[in-house]
Amino acid sequence: MAKIDNAVLPEGSLVLVTGANGFVASHVVEQLLEHGYKVRGTARSASKLANLQKRWDAKYPGRFETAVVEDMLKQGAYDEVIKGAAGVAHIASVVSFSNKYDEVVTPAIGGTLNALRAAAATPSVKRFVLTSSTVSALIPKPNVEGIYLDEKSWNLESIDKAKTLPESDPQKSLWVYAASKTEAELAAWKFMDENKPHFTLNAVLPNYTIGTIFDPETQSGSTSGWMMSLFNGEVSPALALMPPQYYVSAVDIGLLHLGCLVLPQIERRRVYGTAGTFDWNTVLATFRKLYPSKTFPADFPDQGQDLSKFDTAPSLEILKSLGRPGWRSIEESIKDLVGSETA
């Protein structure tokens, strides 16, 4: 573990992590605890964090505490739980994959603004990290060349499609999810520009995240949960609807959040979590290579390739500053996933 020089948040500082029971959030918590920080994690009920609380009590005694926020849209929802925090990682969002705009986009925006308002009213907060997604920049378009995505890229198309596509369209829920991430992040930057609070905002934009599932009871519906289902021979029709795209290790996503919270040179940045491209046949080929004695489903029909390119210079700077030479490979990420589920 690399020592963090001139950290914005001194070691031992308290960080509030919203939606801490989620797959990505649990990896953010893990990296914060591993690097000497204290974490207050929220969930809609204490039971949703019970297994993770036991894990972290055993591994990092006295450094993680559970806080219940039943409704992130309620006025003042975070006002009490944020007290004493030096940093905030707002990860809680709507992941129902409903195709109804008002059920997904509206609460995503409202929850984000609620957390920002609470931070603005809390003098101890120095950094705020919003978990966005690469879909706030673009939904992957297979076999299309010349797409380059940087910190100025926004998926404005998703907002229109989320509002206008018929509910019978099988891709509608994906566009609604993308709109929720796009609009919530845009609302966050607008809040910062208009209110000029005392803290710094950074955003982390992960793509398909693969890694250890810390709590199978609550995280089976995550991206890694879907991949594990394929490992176990279940071919969900939903997988065929997911285009080729980028993957990223959950470890690296945890580190990117950590860097956005504590590294002084990372300010007002949109940081992509895009290690490399994959499709389901890449995953199946990796399964067969790593676990040759196991039988896996047949390959999917050719889905093409994601030919887009992302500006990952800020991401790689963070990883290097935290002692990592670069991205974890898809093989390492899949080993992390399968090992956690078969141990």
Curated annotation (Swiss-Prot):
Transmembrane stretches, start-end: none
Ranges in a coiled coil: none
Pfam family, one: Epimerase
Keyword Membrane attached: no
UniProt EC number: 1.1.1.2
Residues reported to bind NADP(+): 177
Protein name according to UniProt: Aldehyde reductase 2
Organism: Sporidiobolus salmonicolor
